[in-house]
Amino acid sequence: IRCGKELGVAFVLISMGHSGFLPYPERKERLLCSLDRIRREAEAREQPVVLETLTPLESDTCTHPEELADVLDSIASPLLFGMCDVVVPFVMGEDPVNYARILGNRFVHLHLADSNGYDETHLIFGEGCMKVEQIMRDFLAAGYNSRATLELVTHYIEDPSRASQRILMKAKEFQL
């Protein structure tokens, strides 16, 4: 949070971690305790923080928009927000737009990537099996008009320059 403030970033993104399979009550208590520490630091530095859910394989603390809304309600800070990596709900068989519907004005960021349809692998937006044009239309129809990031992750580590060129072409194609 301190570095984000010094760099002048719009927000700092924090992904939900994994508790190591603690029982739910202990897991939730630890999550809220950690997020309250983050809240205090964010408020002291006036630095917005965005929380990202992950899939159940990556996190056992917060994986659905309803859980994220509950966490944001519990912490209640004007500087804590939620976001959606569209691959996460897609591989879980959920509608990514539910994040916008459930979080409302606390929903401030999208990670746009595509999916191979069976795991967390992130492909270039528009090169997988997701109906990306429909997803974009649905987010716009839900009133979302904030930030988005086109994600390139480890799948493209061998040739990131070529992948960057492809993702920029896709951004132009989708007018992002």
Residue ranges and their predicted role:
Residues 2, 8-10, 36, 62-84, ...:
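Histidine-acidic metal/acid-base catalytic patches
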